[in-house]
């Protein structure tokens, strides 16, 4: 069953054009045209001439740019932004609606946080500040909880990832995403760098592989 992308409050969408993004194995369908961004180099690894991950997540309505026409591909993702994206992914795959009400409070992300808490993606007191930059491990944890569509394409264990062990925080989620071909780690060392922050382009790569199974990567 294909799901329609749920559009959240405050997101900016352009005219529909769904012809340029197809994945018969995906639960997602494209709903937004892609025109590029002023600061996104289409010849870079994330660009439409290479992996095209920013284009994919924008077309699917999971991520969007800023009103000044930029995307900030090398800017870091905050926890609140990650929670918003996880809520959209989960709602899309489960045919649910993210509801907005005055009781949500004054922060733009409150409805998304409430949705994620209700659906056990995160707990209400899991993070001390949602304005903090998300780590790579936290991103793995959040998106592993947002969807369960993780068919194994890489038969690997913890010994494949040099800086993650069974005792590492969010170890199970990190390994699950490696095994699913959603995470690949450093091309040379295979390291995941779980404590590092993550850029918007890197997050787009993870999210596009979550949404589009045919883009997942077999590494062994």
Q: Can you annotate each of these PLM segments?
A:
Residues 200-202, 207:
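Non-catalytic cell-wall polysaccharide-engagement segments
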Residues 169-179, 204:
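Alpha-helical membrane segments in multi-pass integral membrane proteins
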Residues 7-10, 80, 137, 201:
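Structural detector for helix-capping/boundary residues
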Residues 54-57, 86, 116, 174-178:
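A short amphipathic alpha-helical interaction element
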Residues 1-16:
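Single conserved hydrophobic/aromatic residue that forms the stacking wall/gate
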Residues 15-49, 64-83, 87-137, 145-172, ...:
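Feature responds to low-complexity, polar/acidic, surface-exposed segments characteristic
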């Amino acid at each position: 069953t294909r799901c329609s992308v749920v559009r959240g409050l405050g997101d900016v969408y352009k005219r529909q054009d769904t012809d340029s993004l197809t994945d018969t194995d995906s639960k997602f369908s494209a709903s937004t045209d892609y025109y590029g961004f002023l600061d996104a180099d289409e010849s870079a690894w994330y660009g439409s001439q290479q992996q095209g991950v920013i284009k994919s997540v924008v077309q699917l309505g999971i991520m969007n740019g800023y009103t000044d026409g930029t995307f900030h591909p090398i800017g870091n993702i905050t926890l609140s932004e990650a929670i918003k994206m996880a809520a959209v992914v989960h709602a899309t795959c489960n045919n649910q609606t993210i509801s907005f009400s005055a009781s949500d409070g004054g922060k733009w992300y409150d409805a998304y946080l409430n949705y994620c808490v209700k659906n056990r993606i995160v707990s209400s007191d899991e993070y001390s500040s949602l304005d903090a930059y998300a780590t790579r491990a936290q991103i793995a944890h959040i998106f592993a909880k947002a969807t369960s569509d993780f068919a194994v394409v890489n038969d690997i264990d913890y010994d494949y990832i040099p800086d993650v062990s069974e005792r590492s925080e969010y170890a199970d989620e990190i390994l699950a995403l490696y095994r699913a071909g959603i995470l690949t780690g450093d091309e040379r060392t295979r390291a995941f760098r779980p404590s590092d922050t993550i850029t918007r382009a890197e997050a787009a790569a993870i999210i596009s592989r979550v949404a589009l199974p045919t883009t997942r990567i077999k590494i062994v």
